[in-house]
Each structure stands twice: as structure tokens, then as C-alpha cells.
Amino acid sequence: MCGILAVLGVADVSLAKRSRIIELSRRLRHRGPDWSGIHCYQDCYLAHQRLAIVDPTSGDQPLYNEDKSVVVTVNGEIYNHEELKANLKSHKFQTASDCEVIAHLYEEYGEEFVDMLDGMFAFVLLDTRDKSFIAARDAIGICPLYMGWGLDGSVWFSSEMKALSDDCERFISFPPGHLYSSKTGGLRRWYNPPWFSESIPSTPYNPLLLRQSFEKAIIKRLMTDVPFGVLLSGGLDSSLVASVVSRHLAEAKVAAQWGNKLHTFCIGLKGSPDLRAAKEVADYLGTVHHELHFTVQEGIDALEEVIYHVETYDVTTIRASTPMFLMSRKIKSLGVKMVLSGEGSDEIFGGYLYFHKAPNKKEFHEETCRKIKALHLYDCLRANKSTSAWGVEARVPFLDKNFINVAMDIDPEWKMIKRDLGRIEKWVLRNAFDDEEKPYLPKHILYRQKEQFSDGVGYSWIDGLKDHANEHVSDSMMMNASFVYPENTPVTKEAYYYRTIFEKFFPKNAARLTVPGGPSVACSTAKAVEWDAAWSKNLDPSGRAALGVHDAAYEDTLQKSPASANPVLDNGFGPALGESMVKTVASATAV
């Protein structure tokens, strides 16, 4: 991942303004520690902090067309850049960077080229011939992008909020799958897949097609000129990613440079069952496995840094981001700059445990659509910013455009969880990779129950967070929470504690509004809370809040351990809510 900052149409064109923009761009240097660049044209500035993954020697940014009349600063990876270049034979490329193709596509097709890009990206392009500019973000929002407005009428774009929040009074999270054009002065959606309308598909389930499309998504993401690995938790999604990479690594170009032994990484509290599960998968696949550990106190000590980097006060995101943040630092110290991760599968296939209560296929499908549309506010944000904090790039094959189209075109009747038919959550994915002749994974891993990421770190992690928050947030503070924080009022002490840290770094109202809110159970949307009347009384992001679904649900454990406090203030769940919470070690894949 790189860091981009673009400021267009400023009133002040002094050297002091240029210095200020360079200073703000440095706030993104963690995203791109390999090189810095800036292009200034009259009242427009495009700055870049580079993480060199493809073409490390000549791909420094900003990038240009032949006569430098078109300038672009990009954060992303364009997996089909060679195919696109082949259709641009009249153009002369200056670098081997996958991102340079954007400048030349603009010359050929104007603003209508974005849907041709297969990859993850956020970019700003300036046409100096008429001083027009465009900005765009990838289909799902894998790469972060913010847009702001200065008091002088300038328009700002940044990979992270921290580079524009001080100088813009108003700013937003740039919507995924959209393009901004200065010519029209507005945003428009360039990504219009069939599933976006939420109409119910009727295509029969084709396991071979699903498997093949996922393998293609993996293979294209092996495009790298630097060492890479896979985040492996021992859960289904990360294990499938590791398995498919293992099968195809030897034939990939990267193997010639870095060898055909796959490196896998996991992190967790010592003694966690998922450390053993991840090692079992790694041994089965023959990977070079790196098992990393952290303590509850180390996680708590990192909270301020995590919230600063991830730029949210959402409880689930912070719980899950912290181990991923710690792991990314270790990964970078080992010389690895890119990892593949398993985000997105639960949204596409209804893998969260609350989907067991979906009343029919219509509501099941509509909820998956809502979840995918919100990914940029949750798992994409976590995966990108937790890794980018240490200059590591995370690639997410489940969010491949073509794979999503294939998966979301399946009649949702096949995705419904039906225990009487032997269909557990994500059965269509599990079944697609259930190969008796050449197994991808051991059966018990392939059919393992979903464990939510922050749950999987263990109750000793989550309870440690709650205990720490209880020491810093009093009952009287909670009584006044709605007055102190009228926007997205925190309803637990843990949420209140995170909010105080967030406000220290990002005190403006515009920053608060970039974070989602509303009721949720086990990571559901507010709409899905209506599926079970009991859920409205038990709104917690933990997967075990899906009462009557999880093997170690809260209701089962509460019979063994009394609630410790006011349920309004701390969710009412005591510290002994089941040692089985020490599962799904923080591989940062939420699987």
C-alpha cells in the first residue's frame, strides 16, 4: 500500500503551502516508506509515499503520460495491467509500474476507463491541459480514500484522514466504486454489478465455477517483485487462501525470484487452540510457518497507536485490528512486504453465525448485499490500515470483482444454513473445495464452524479490554455519554474508552461521521437484528451474541458464570464467559 495526498485549486501557491502539503504527506509515510514524490502545477499538488511492490527500481510516483500533461498519484495494484498495456500499443510507457497504465487509459478513453481496471486502487489524476481532475476508488473500497474541502475552495483527497483533517473543516469517506469529476463537480458510481440492486438471483450453484474463479483470483494476486506470505488462522477462509497459493506458487513468476516455499503467519495468545489449528494447516500444506505471540497487556499498550492508524472507534474493528497491527510489525521485520488475507468471505457467503436466523433466502441475500456494501467501513479498513501502519500490503482475493459476481449470482437458497441437509455456514464454498482425490484441506478444517476474529483471540483478550475500560470509564461518565457524544453515543464502557482516544486524534465532527453506528449483533447490520427478538437485548459484536447458534453462545456460558455488572454499561458478560473464546487466533483474517 502507498499513501496519496492531492490538493487541488488552492488559493495560496507560495512555497510555504508546498511545504505544508509535504508535511501533511509525511503523515502517510508509514504506508509508503520506500520513496516520496510530489508534483506541483500552478494551484494543484499531487504527493505520494511509495511502498514498492511491483517494479521497485523505476516505479516511483507521481506517474505521467508521455509529455507529462497527465499526472496521476495511485495507491493500489492493477492486476490486469499487462493486458491493458497490450491494447495501448501507440503509447510509450516510462516504467514497468502496474499503475502507469492509468494515465494512458485516461488519454484513450477519458473518464470512462475505470471499470477496465482489475485490482484495488484509489487514485487522483490531473489533466494539466485544462486543469480538470478525477479521483476514483476501487469497487469494494479495499484501498482507503477520503475527500475534503478547504475553506479556500480547494478539494483534497487522501489515503487516510490524518493528512487532511487539520486543514479541512468538512471531509468524508470517499464511497467505493465511485468517481469524482471536477468537470461535473460531483460523484458518480462507476461500479454497477448485477447484485448491487439486491434483486434475488436464480442461477444454480456450480461448485466447479466457484472454485475456478477463486483460484484465478488468487493467481493474479501473486503479482509481486518482493517477498510475500499468507495470513493463516486455521479457519476456513485463510486456510483456503494458503492452500490455493501453495498449489500454484511454483508456476508463478515470483517463485523464480523468491522460491516456491510459501511463508504463513499467525498471531495469538500463548495456548490458543487456533495456534495449533494454524500449525496443523501449515504442516499439511508444507509451508514455512511463523507463529507469533502477544500478551493482553501488549495489546492494551498498542490501543492508542491502533486507533490513530485505523481511524475508527468501532469496537469490533479495534478488537480485531490490534493483533493484526502487532503481527504486521513482526512480518515487516522479517522482510515481507505483501500478504494475502481472507477478508470478505463471510459477507459474500453469509458466514457470520447470525445468518442461521435468516428467515428466507430474500432476506439472506439482501443482508449479504448490505454487508458487502459496508465492507470499506469495517474489514477492509482494518485489513488495509493495520498492515499499512508498518508498510505491509494486504491483498484480499475473496473481494476479486469477478469472484464476487460469480458468488453473488448463486441462488441464495443454496447459501441458506440448513442443518437438516448438512449445510453449515458457507457450505457452498466448503463444498466447492471438497476434493476427495486431491484434498485442499483436512475435512475437519474444511468444515470447521465459523469463529469471529475478535472472539477468536480469546476472552482473556476481550475481557482484558473490558476490564481496562472499566478502570478508565466510570458509571457517571456513562450516564452523561449522550451529552458528551451525541453522535454515535457509546453504549458500553469499552466503546466510550475507544471514543475518547479517537477524539484526541480526530476532534472534528466530520471525523466522527466517518465511523458507522447503529445496533448490531455478531457483526450484523441493524436490519438483521430484527430476525430474532432476543438479539435486541443482547447487542454485542461478539459472534457468541448469536444466541442459540454458536457452540459456545453467551446464553450457554451465562448459566455457568453470573453476569458481573450492569448490562447497559458493560454488556453484562463476566470475565469467565468460556475459555473456548481463546479461538481463531488473530491471523487478521477474521475467519
UniProtKB/Swiss-Prot annotation:
Catalytic-site annotation from UniProt: C2
Record key words, sorted: Amino-acid biosynthesis, Asparagine biosynthesis, ATP-binding, Glutamine amidotransferase, Ligase, Nucleotide-binding
SUPFAM superfamilies: Adenine nucleotide alpha hydrolases-like, N-terminal nucleophile aminohydrolases (Ntn hydrolases)
Ranges where the Glutamine amidotransferase type-2 domain occurs: 2-185
Record site: Important for beta-aspartyl-AMP intermediate formation: E343
Tissue expression pattern: Expressed in companion cells of leaf sheath vascular bundles, and phloem-parenchyma cells, nucellar projections and nucellar epidermis of dorsal vascular bundles of grains.
EC number: 6.3.5.4
Binding site for ATP: L231, I267, S341, G342
Keyword ATP-binding: yes
Catalytic activity: L-aspartate + L-glutamine + ATP + H2O = L-asparagine + L-glutamate + AMP + diphosphate + H(+)
InterPro entries linked to this entry: Asn_synth_AEB, Asn_synthase, Asn_Synthetase, AsnB_N, GATase_2_dom, Ntn_hydrolases_N, Rossmann-like_a/b/a_fold
Pfam families: Asn_synthase (PF00733), GATase_7 (PF13537)
Cellular component, GO annotation: cytosol
All residue ranges annotated as the Asparagine synthetase domain in the record: 193-516
GO molecular function annotation: asparagine synthase (glutamine-hydrolyzing) activity; ATP binding
Alphabetical list of PROSITE patterns matching this protein: GATASE_TYPE_2
Its job: Essential for nitrogen assimilation, distribution and remobilization within the plant via the phloem.
NCBIfam families assigned: asn_synth_AEB, PRK09431.1
Protein name: Asparagine synthetase [glutamine-hydrolyzing] 2
